[in-house]
Amino acid sequence: GLKIATGEYIGFVDSDDDIETDMYEKMYNAALKYKVDFVMCDYQRINSNRTNFNKTLDIDSGFYDKEKIRSDIFPALIMGSNIDYGPLLSVCLCLYKRQFLTDNSITFANDVKWSEDNLFSAIVGYKCNSFYYLKTEYLYHYYSNPGTITTSYRAGAWNVYCKMNEYLHNFFDQISDYDFSEQLKIHMIYYACNCLGMASKLSEEDALH
C-alpha cells in the first residue's frame, strides 16, 4: 500500500476496527496547522461485552519538536523500562505525511508479520522532526475480540520477533547520538514473556504440535 499510495497523507485502519467520521479531518487540519511529520490521537477500546474505555497516553498534549521528542519520547521509543510499549506504538492512531515516509525510506518489513507497528513506529519516532498529539481526542475505535491475531497464540511468533529485534539492532546500533541498547534488550525480554504467556494457554495436545 505504501508503494502505490499517492495521497499527501497516509493513515491505517485495521479491518476489525472503525473510526470517528471526522478523525482524519481533525488530524489533517492539525498536520497542516503545525506543519508536522505526523499527527497522533487517542483511542476508545471496545471489549467483546461492549464496554468502552477511553485510552490516553502518559505524555503531554500538543506539539513536539526534535528536542521534546528526544527528552520525552526517546527514553521509551522502542520499549519502556517497565517492559511495556512506548507511546508511539500504534500506526492506527497516526496520520503520516507521505513525503516524510518516502524521504526516509520507512516501510514495513515483509518478514515481520506480527507486531510490525513496533518496528515501524520506532524508526518513525527517531527520524521525525516534529509531531502533534491530539490528547483526549478518542477518534479511533479498537475492538478487543478474543481470537484476533493480537490475542491468540501464533506458531512461529518467536522467530518473527527475533527478526524484528534484528532489524531494530541494524538500525539503532548505527546511531551515535542516543543509547538505545537497554531498550533493545528489554524489547527481547518483552517478546520472550509474550511467547511464553501465549504458549502457557495452549492445551497439552496443541503445545506438542
Residue ranges and their predicted role:
Residues 133-209:
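C-terminal subregions of glycosyltransferases and related glycan-biosynthesis enzymes
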Residues 13-15:
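Catalytic metal- and UDP-sugar-binding loop of GT-A-like glycosyltransferases, i.e.
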